[in-house]
Each structure stands twice: as C-alpha cells, then as structure tokens.
UniProtKB/Swiss-Prot annotation:
Belongs to the ChdC family. Type 1 subfamily. The gene is chdC. SUPFAM superfamilies: Dimeric alpha+beta barrel (SSF54909). Its EC number is 1.3.98.5. This is Coproheme decarboxylase. Pfam families: Chlor_dismutase (PF06778). Pathway: Porphyrin-containing compound metabolism; protoheme biosynthesis. GO terms for molecular function: heme binding; metal ion binding; oxidoreductase activity, acting on the CH-CH group of donors, oxygen as acceptor; peroxidase activity. Fe-coproporphyrin III binds at residues 131, 145-149, 172, 185. Involved in coproporphyrin-dependent heme b biosynthesis. Catalyzes the decarboxylation of Fe-coproporphyrin III (coproheme) to heme b (protoheme IX), the last step of the pathway. The reaction occurs in a stepwise manner with a three-propionate intermediate. The keyword Iron applies. One of its GO terms (biological process) is heme B biosynthetic process.
Amino acid sequence: MSQAAETLDGWYSLHLFYAVDWPTLRLVPDEDRIQIVQEFHDFLDKLASVRDDHNGDHALYNITGQKADILLWVLRPEMQELNSIELALNKLRIADYLVPTYSYVSIIELSNYLAGKSDEDPYENPHVKARLYPELPHSDYICFYPMNKRRNETYNWYMLSMEERQKLMYDHGMIGRKYAGKIKQFITGSVGFDDYEWGVTLFAQDPLQFKKIVYEMRFDETTARYGDFGSFFVGHVLPEETLETFFRI
C-alpha cells in the first residue's frame, strides 16, 4: 500500500454561496429593506469581532456570473462554530431573500510532501501557524474551485509511491511560486467532509492572474494526468460599508 501523506490541519472552513432573490426583494419597502440590510451588517460585524483575538476570519465577495451573487467564506477553530454561524445567518431576515446555490466544507491544510525533516513541532513554527490560522488578505478578487486527484485504471494518484508524489508536487509548487506577490493561495482539505477532496481559494488584485496560473498549471504533470476540477467561482470584494447600496433597488 502506498504511504499516505500526513497533513497539518488548521481552521475549519465554510464557503457559502447565495443568489439574491431580486424580484422578491424589490417588493420590500425601502425602510424595511434598510433595516434588513443593517441587521445583516451587524451580523458581519459580530463575525469580524473574533479577528482581534485571532480566533477566525471571514471574507465577503460579489460573485461574477449566474452561479451566485454572494460568497461568504468563514474560518473558525471548531466545525460546530460554522454550524452556529450558518444557523444565525439563516435566522436573519435577509435569509428570506438569499437562495443557497452552493457550499463547501473543509479545513485549512498543509501536506508533508515538501516538508523537510525536523524535530521541531510544526504547530509552533510561526510561518506554519500563519498559514494554518491565516488572516485573510481581502484582495480585490477571489477565485474558488474544488478538485480531486484522479484515480482510474490509467492514472491513479493514490497508487503512486510517496517519492513519485513528492517529485510531482515539487514541480507543481514551483509553478505556484512564480505567482508569489500576485496570488495568495489557501488549500483546504475536504476528504470525508464534502464531494471533492480539496478546495482551492485564490486572492489577487488582478483577476487575470487566476487565468494565467490555472492555465500554466494545466501543462504540469500533476494537473494534466491527475487533476479533476469542479466549478470555478470568481468575484470582487464586497465591502461591508457598501451593503446598503448593493441591496438597494
């Protein structure tokens, strides 16, 4: 049996995608709509309060295209906290006008494919901790997609030796390093949590960088032979102070 990769696991992750029911929201009187949006704003302020204690983070984005209008990405130390947050959101009046279109449950993950040998506790390494328990960059643009490692009769990632996988992941990672300073990447593991094995969340100031890195990686052996992908979601940051304008009709 091939050796399984070990992982370092950080905060639990929940991507929530919603479409806005604009026809129904249009029937709401302006005064009521303003109160509904303010209640949503207060909810987001409460989510943000954990940042000061470094107990999680969240990001809010306006998704481009018809797959969704809004993405709320939440990170917390415990999965149960994600349940509580989603429940609280569902109880808000704004939820009457938000139609769930997709969600993704996972956990911030680092693998040991590229790790060197050390007796150090990785969870005490400041660089590792910053990646497992991140402060999100809130860049202008976001891209999210789920993915699997292919396993079929021709190409099966899980039948490769650890050495083969390490070599492939090293080459794969070298492409990613070319985009340092242009793209911030977060990998979340979802085996046993959701329909795919990983989620990939990218942040950038220029959305064209998403196209460039994904296209370049198509020619990498790790992706070309062993990568299967779900839907891609891309969007622009939705500052909370602009919510009233966003929901105004």
